[in-house]
Amino acid sequence: MVRPLNCIVAVSQNMGIGKNGDFPWPMLRNEFKYFQRMTTTSSVEGKQNLVIMGRKTWFSIPEKNRPLKDRINIVLSRELKEPPQGAHFLAKSLDDALKLIEQPELADKVDMVWIVGGSSVYKEAMNQPGHLRLFVTRIMQEFESDTFFPEIDLEKYKLLPEYPGVLSEVQEEKGIKYKFEVYEKKG
């Protein structure tokens, strides 16, 4: 079964997603709650969502919050020999992770698959064939960053006018405006 892949990211106007292993902007509590809700809520009873992230993204999560709870966590790394403490699975590449999800032990347990970073993992996911959705929080100002989100190819990805459970109006926290967008590529 080929499942749709979902990427979720918050990105500043200059496409920044990280700085020194953290977000370039101050903590936006409601934006974080949106991330938690979207990546955790399964639409199928008895199944869990699964999150895939690179090694640096994993270690950027405060230890007390690892693994991301109520989700199956896969960490990608070519260097690590075993899953980092708290992670459920380790895979060498996104392709390997996607194959792992279709193995009998996981196939029946997984509902939605979410890619949660970082840059190279997003890039690889966005170039995958097939059905992809990008859940993008547009932080409506620039922040100094050292990690960036790949350009969204609007020939392939269509911005959806609305999406269930996603607010369409501009949000504001700590004087920072942002809005939620959903892009889709049918593959």
Curated annotation (Swiss-Prot):
Subunit-structure text: Homodimer.
Compartments (UniProt record): Mitochondrion; Cytoplasm
N6-acetyllysine PTM sites in chain numbering: K33
A single GO cellular-component term on record: cytoplasm
Binding site for substrate: E31, F32, K33, Y34, F35, Q36, R71
EC class name: oxidoreductase
Native species: Mesocricetus auratus
Region span, Involved in methotrexate binding: 8-37, 60-70
Primary role: Key enzyme in folate metabolism. Contributes to the de novo mitochondrial thymidylate biosynthesis pathway. Catalyzes an essential reaction for de novo glycine and purine synthesis, and for DNA precursor synthesis. Binds its own mRNA.
Reactions the enzyme catalyzes: (6S)-5,6,7,8-tetrahydrofolate + NADP(+) = 7,8-dihydrofolate + NADPH + H(+)
UniProt pathway annotation: Cofactor biosynthesis; tetrahydrofolate biosynthesis; 5,6,7,8-tetrahydrofolate from 7,8-dihydrofolate: step 1/1
Name of the protein this chain belongs to: Dihydrofolate reductase
Annotated positions of the N6-succinyllysine modification: K33
Keyword tags: Acetylation, Cytoplasm, Methotrexate resistance, Mitochondrion, NADP, One-carbon metabolism, Oxidoreductase, RNA-binding
Note from the entry: Overexpression of the dihydrofolate gene (generally involving gene amplification) results in resistance to the antitumor antifolate drugs methotrexate (MTX) and methasquin.
Example of a GO MF term: NADP binding
Any one of the GO BP annotations: response to methotrexate
Gene3D superfamilies in alphabetical order: Dihydrofolate Reductase, subunit A
Binding residues annotated for NADP(+), in chain numbering: 10, 16-22, 55-57, 77-79, 117-124
Residues annotated for methotrexate binding in this entry: T137
Family listed: Belongs to the dihydrofolate reductase family.
Ranges where the DHFR domain occurs: 4-185
EC number from the UniProt entry: 1.5.1.3
